Amino acid sequence: GENILETLASRFAEIDARAEINQAKVLAAMQKNRVNATHFAASTGYGYDDEGRDNLERVYADAFHTEAALVRPQITCGTHALAVALSANLLPGDELLAISGKPYDTLEEVIGIRPSPCSLAEYGVSYRQVDLLDDGSFDLPAIRAAISAKTKLIHIQRSKGYQPRPTLSVAQIGEAIAVCRAVKPDVTIMVDNCYGEFVETI
C-alpha cells in the first residue's frame, strides 16, 4: 500500500496542481462576471431578462475562452448539445467532415450514418470522415485533401469514446485546426471536448 502511494505521489501532485489552475480559471471567470446570490434566483415565464442564465453563459464563455456559450437545462446530454450545434450550423447541401474518425454511436442517427428520421442526411447534409492513423493521431495529409468547397463544418471528437485509441491532446487538436484553416479559413470547426479543458491547462 505505502509503496504504491509513494510511486504515484508525483502523479497525484501533478493532477492536484492542474486542478488548482483550472479551479482558479473558473473562479476568475465568476469574479469577472460578479456572480452573486441574485444570479441563483429562479425565473419564470419565457426567461426574458434572466440575468442568472445570461451571467452563467458569460462565466462559461470566459472560463472556456470562447466568444459565447449556450448553457440551458433544456439541453439534456452531450449528444443533445452536439445535435443542436450541428443542426444550427449546417444547411441542405452542406458537408460535415469528421476528421477524428467515426463519432460516438449516439451521433450516428443524428448525422444519418445509421438511417433515422430527421437526421442531417434526411435534410440534405452530406457526411464524410477521415480516420485517424494507427497510432491514434490525425492523418494531416488526408485531412488536407478531404476538405472541399462543400465542407461547411469539421467535427473533431477529442475523447476516445469506445475506440481503442488515446484521447487527443490540445496540441494535436490545435495542429489539426491549423491545417484545416490553411485549406479553408472560413470553415466552422466543432470540437467535442468532453470536459477535456479540465484535464489539461489552457
Give the residues covered by each predicted segment.
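Aromatic- and Gly/Pro-rich donor/ligand-binding loops
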Residues: 42
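Generic structural marker for isolated residues within well-ordered, non-membrane alpha-helices
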Residues: 57
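Conserved PLP-enzyme active-site core in the AAT-like
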Residues: 4-9, 16, 26-27, 31-39, ...
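A short alpha-helical cap/connector motif
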Residues: 18-21
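Short beta-strand to alpha-helix junction loop
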Residues: 48-52
